């Protein structure tokens, strides 16, 4: 029996395959595409290394009515198994972009092939920078009042990782897209901006949840409240003098590096300007010398030319004495 999934690792080839599947089947529509995920489960870490699309249809008016081709799935899995016997069905993917009512039934269908399938929602048209995958697993939840058990999706961490061969391929694909003029500092600032934006979104979600609990709209979940308390306890006290001093020192160091970089860039540009100016002056001097040289005139035949003419006449017999009659 496989270990219960705690996190997922999605490879870039899977993302490319899903985007290709979506562009071929459901581009410019409101439909989504569904497929199977292949990989391995290593102590709860699900490594998704391959995938393939499945014929899938669902009724737009009634999302609970859907169709998935089982025979196609089993035939495809048998062919993939011949290529790589280590890859097993670990779950399924959907282009979402959110959880839909039929997802619980589809997830139960994939339990035939793996005890704990993961559902990965892949956003094929992300509006924000970041990881375009969200992973979920189903957990059983018991209602304290009715003692009835229900299944619900629980979010688990998701990341993008690649092996060496995949990294080389991705670098070739992004070679014409990547702008080499972007400095590492700009990249770091962009990454920090994205991280802060995600942090703000998570804080707003926690605030909204706590407000609903205080208003009595939602029942308090002590596990979630405990997680929020741990996050608050781990947050630093920004009002402390040491942290303010550290921020000031870091900011001063960063500004010093930026200032020195600008100065070096200016000095190099000035040096190149001087070199170009010197080269232009040398070129102008050479042009003046060439223009001031008088043109050559026609001269009398040289001694060498006369010698050649004499040899030619001797060859023709012009210098031989004529015979007397």
Curated annotation (Swiss-Prot):
PROSITE patterns listed in its UniProt record: MPN
UniProt-listed CDD domains: MPN_RPN7_8
Region (Disordered): 285-325
GO biological process: proteasome-mediated ubiquitin-dependent protein catabolic process
GO molecular function: metallopeptidase activity
A GO-annotated cellular component: proteasome complex
Segments of skewed composition (Low complexity): 292-302
Keyword Transcription appears in the UniProt entry: no
Keywords tagged on the record: Proteasome
Residue stretches making up the MPN domain: 8-142
Highest rank taxon of the organism: Eukaryota
Protein family membership: Belongs to the peptidase M67A family.
Name of the featured protein: 26S proteasome non-ATPase regulatory subunit 7
């Amino acid at each position: 029996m496989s270990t219960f999934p705690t996190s997922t690792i999605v490879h870039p080839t899977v993302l490319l395959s899903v985007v290709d599947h979506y562009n071929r089947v459901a581009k410019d529509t409101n439909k989504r595409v569904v497929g199977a995920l292949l990989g391995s489960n290593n102590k709860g870490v699900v490594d998704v290394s391959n995938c393939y699309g499945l014929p899938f249809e669902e009724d737009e008016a009634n999302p609970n009515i859907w169709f998935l081709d089982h025979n196609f799935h089993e035939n495809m899995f048998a062919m993939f198994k011949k290529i790589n016997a280590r890859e097993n069905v670990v779950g399924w993917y959907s282009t979402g972009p959110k959880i839909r009512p039929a997802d619980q039934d589809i997830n139960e269908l994939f339990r035939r092939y793996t005890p704990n399938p993961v559902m990965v929602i892949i956003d094929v048209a992300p509006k924000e920078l970041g990881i375009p995958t969200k992973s979920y697993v189903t957990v059983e939840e018991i209602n304290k009042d009715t003692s009835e058990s229900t299944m619900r999706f629980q979010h688990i961490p998701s990341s993008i990782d690649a092996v060496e061969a995949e990294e080389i391929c991705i670098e070739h694909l992004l070679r014409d897209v990547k702008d080499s003029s972007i400095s590492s500092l700009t990249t770091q600032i962009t990454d920090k901006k994205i991280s802060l934006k995600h942090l703000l979104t998570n804080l707003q979600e926690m605030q909204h949840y706590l407000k609903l609990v205080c208003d009595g709209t939602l029942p308090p979940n002590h596990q979630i409240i405990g997680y929020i308390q741990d996050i608050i306890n781990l947050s630093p006290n920004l009002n402390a003098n040491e942290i303010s001093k550290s921020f000031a020192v870091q900011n001063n160091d960063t500004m010093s590096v930026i200032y020195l970089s600008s100065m070096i860039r200016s000095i190099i540009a000035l040096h190149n300007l001087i070199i170009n100016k010197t080269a232009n002056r040398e070129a102008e001097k050479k042009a003046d010398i060439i223009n001031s040289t008088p043109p050559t005139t026609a001269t009398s035949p040289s001694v060498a030319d006369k010698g050649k003419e004499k040899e030619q006449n001797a060859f023709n017999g012009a210098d031989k004495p004529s015979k007397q009659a």
